[in-house]
């Protein structure tokens, strides 16, 4: 009886560890951010990678590992086309745990696309939490005056990043 119980506990731990490893993210990883609604031409991508950041600016400073998320979106209409919004924000979240807002910047082009819209870029590289396949990365509307975050216009999960 005791041996059966130990065997069952060992098997449960092995299966639990195997499923946890099966869901680990392979870095670096890029995902395509898909339009949430039918908005012509918009497209985006996110690059998720591990980076080493020094603790200080001093030479030889020890480094700490963080996860960085970079977001690129193109052919984006002005945010005001969707209502009371004046910017886009990248947004990464582990559902029901934690989220990060990513400041986005419009890229001024020398020769804008005749399709319209503008590219927006941003990155955040201070994530210490372990990301999972269920992590959602999106580009959302935002109002800088009220700090109100609007709905997502592009979105995807990290499921395509699983080893």
Regions found by a protein language model. Give the residues of each.
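Bacterial N-terminal signal peptides that target proteins for export
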Residues: 1-7
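Bacterial N-terminal signal peptides
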Residues: 8-16
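N-terminal targeting/export leaders
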Residues: 20-163
């Amino acid at each position: 009886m005791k041996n059966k119980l130990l065997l069952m506990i060992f098997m449960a731990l092995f299966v639990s560890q195997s499923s946890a490893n099966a869901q680990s993210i392979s870095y670096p990883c890029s995902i395509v951010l898909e339009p949430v609604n039918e908005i012509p031409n918009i497209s985006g991508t996110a690059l998720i990678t591990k980076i080493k950041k020094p603790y200080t600016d001093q030479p030889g400073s020890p480094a700490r590992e963080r996860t960085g998320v970079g977001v690129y979106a193109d052919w984006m209409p002005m945010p005001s086309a969707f209502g009371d919004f004046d910017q886009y924000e990248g947004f990464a979240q582990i559902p029901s745990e934690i989220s990060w807002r990513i400041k986005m910047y419009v890229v001024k082009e020398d020769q804008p696309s005749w399709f319209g819209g503008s590219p927006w870029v941003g990155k955040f590289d201070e994530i210490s939490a372990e990301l999972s396949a269920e992590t959602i990365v999106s580009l959302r509307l935002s109002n800088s005056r009220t700090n109100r975050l609007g709905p997502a216009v592009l979105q995807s999960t990290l499921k395509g990043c699983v080893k």
